Structure formats: structure tokens, C-alpha cells
Amino acid sequence: MANKQKIRIRLKAFDHQVLDQSAEKIVETAKRTGAKVSGPVPLPTEREVITILRAPHKYKDSREQFEMRTHKRLIDILLPTPKTVDALMRLDLPAGVDIEIKL
């Protein structure tokens, strides 16, 4: 069987616009260096809801809810070249995006 290499990149961010811009940068960089790209695939958004009391002592019926959404994208780079890996390492992405890379 042939040696199949792929790089799997998972992106996470609270702001979906910044996340999509980062994903487009990665896809464009990989395609420019000659690798095949699959994605970006939108993964389910995590939604965390936090409920707190509005008043410091009593009034238990008065509560406030806050939510935090974590948007995720998945990009697979198939048949990466050394040039692709080098270009991805030098890529400058925004600070609000978390990146996980698996080889």
C-alpha cells in the first residue's frame, strides 16, 4: 500500500468571522504549494450557558444567563510537500484562533 500522509488541522475560535478568514489563509497557502486540500469542514458549535443570580443575596427568581459559543473548523491537507509544511509554519494567524495540528 502507498504511503499516505495527511495533515489534519482543527481550528477553534469564539468569533466565526476570524475563524473563516484563518481557514481561507491556510487553504490558500496549501493549494499554492501544490497540496490537495479537503475543507474547511464546519464542525458542531459548542454552546456553554452560564446562569447566575442578578442580586447578591435573595431574589432567587431573578437570574441572568450568559452564553459562550466555540466555533470549529476542520481542514485536511492530503499529500503535503516539504514546501507546504514550511509555508504553514511561517503563516501568521490572528491571536483569537486556537490551532491543533496532527500529522
Curated annotation (Swiss-Prot):
Keywords: Ribonucleoprotein, Ribosomal protein. Transmembrane segments: none annotated. It holds the Pfam family Ribosomal_S10. InterPro entries: Ribosomal_uS10 (IPR001848), Ribosomal_uS10_CS (IPR018268), Ribosomal_uS10_dom (IPR027486), Ribosomal_uS10_dom_sf (IPR036838). GO terms for biological process: translation. GO terms for cellular component: ribonucleoprotein complex; ribosome. GO terms for molecular function: structural constituent of ribosome; tRNA binding. SUPFAM superfamilies: Ribosomal protein S10. Involved in the binding of tRNA to the ribosomes. PANTHER family: 30S RIBOSOMAL PROTEIN S10 FAMILY MEMBER (PTHR11700). Belongs to the universal ribosomal protein uS10 family. Part of the 30S ribosomal subunit. This is Small ribosomal subunit protein uS10. It comes from Acetivibrio thermocellus (strain ATCC 27405 / DSM 1237 / JCM 9322 / NBRC 103400 / NCIMB 10682 / NRRL B-4536 / VPI 7372) (Clostridium thermocellum).
